[in-house]
C-alpha cells in the first residue's frame, strides 16, 4: 500500500463584506486528505466538456475503498485569503476502522446565497486530485467530512465559516458564528 495525497482545493470568490469586524473574509479553502489504499474516486455532475458542474447545496465527492482497515491518516484544512493562511485545522487519523466493509469518505461543500459558482477538475500530478470552485458566497459556507462503513456513519466533521445561522437543521436559528466554528 502506498500513500496517496488527495487535495480538495476550493477557491471561493470574494465574500461580501459585513459590518461585523470579527468576520475575516477569505477566498480559498484548501482541504487535503491523506489516505492509504484509495482504489477509486467517485464524483458527479460532469458536463459534456468533462468539467464538474457544482451545485453547492447538493455537491458531494465520495472516496471509496474496498476495506475500512485503512481509514485516513489526517485531514488538513487551510483558510486562505490573498495567498496568506489566516487559519488552519487538522483532523487526526481515524480511529474507528472495520475490515471487510466498504469504506466511504464523503466530502460536501455548501454555499448559501451563491452567485453562479462552478467547479473544474485539476489536471496535474496523477497522485493529486483537486477541484477548484469559484464564485461568491454571500452568507458563508459549510464544509462536511463524513466517514462511513457501508451505510453506517462512523465520524462526521463540520467546518462552518462566516454567517452560518442558515446552516441549522431547521433553517430558522438566530445564532451565527462570526468567525470560524469547527
Curated annotation (Swiss-Prot):
| An example Gene Ontology CC term for this record | host cell endoplasmic reticulum
Question: Pfam families annotated for this entry?
Answer: CrmD_SECRET (PF07190)
Principal subcellular localization: host cell
Coiled-coil stretches are: none
Key word Cell membrane present in the record? no
Q: Where in the cell is it found?
A: Host endoplasmic reticulum
Q: Which UniProt keywords apply?
A: Host endoplasmic reticulum
Into which family does the record put it? Belongs to the orthopoxvirus OPG192 family.
What name goes with this protein?
Protein OPG192
- What is the native source organism of this protein? Monkeypox virus
Taxonomic lineage from the root: Viruses, Varidnaviria, Bamfordvirae, Nucleocytoviricota, Pokkesviricetes
Amino acid at each position: 500500500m502506498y500513500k496517496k495525497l488527495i487535495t480538495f482545493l476550493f477557491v471561493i470568490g470574494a465574500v461580501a463584506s459585513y459590518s461585523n469586524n470579527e468576520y475575516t473574509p477569505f477566498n480559498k479553502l484548501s482541504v487535503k486528505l491523506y489516505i492509504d489504499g484509495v482504489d477509486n474516486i467517485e464524483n458527479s455532475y460532469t458536463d459534456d466538456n468533462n468539467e464538474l458542474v457544482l451545485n453547492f447545496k447538493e455537491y458531494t465527492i465520495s472516496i471509496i475503498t474496498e476495506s475500512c482497515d485503512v481509514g485516513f491518516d489526517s485531514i488538513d484544512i487551510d483558510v486562505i485569503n490573498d495567498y496568506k493562511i489566516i487559519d488552519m485545522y487538522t483532523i487526526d487519523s481515524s480511529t474507528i476502522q472495520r475490515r471487510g466493509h466498504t469504506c466511504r469518505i464523503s466530502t460536501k461543500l455548501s454555499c448559501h446565497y451563491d452567485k453562479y459558482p462552478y467547479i473544474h477538475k485539476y489536471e496535474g500530478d496523477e497522485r493529486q486530485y483537486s477541484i477548484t470552485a469559484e464564485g461568491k458566497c454571500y452568507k458563508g459556507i459549510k464544509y462536511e467530512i463524513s466517514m462511513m462503513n457501508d451505510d453506517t456513519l462512523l465520524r462526521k466533521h463540520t467546518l462552518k465559516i462566516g454567517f452560518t445561522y442558515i446552516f441549522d437543521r431547521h433553517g430558522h436559528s438566530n445564532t451565527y458564528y462570526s468567525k470560524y466554528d469547527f
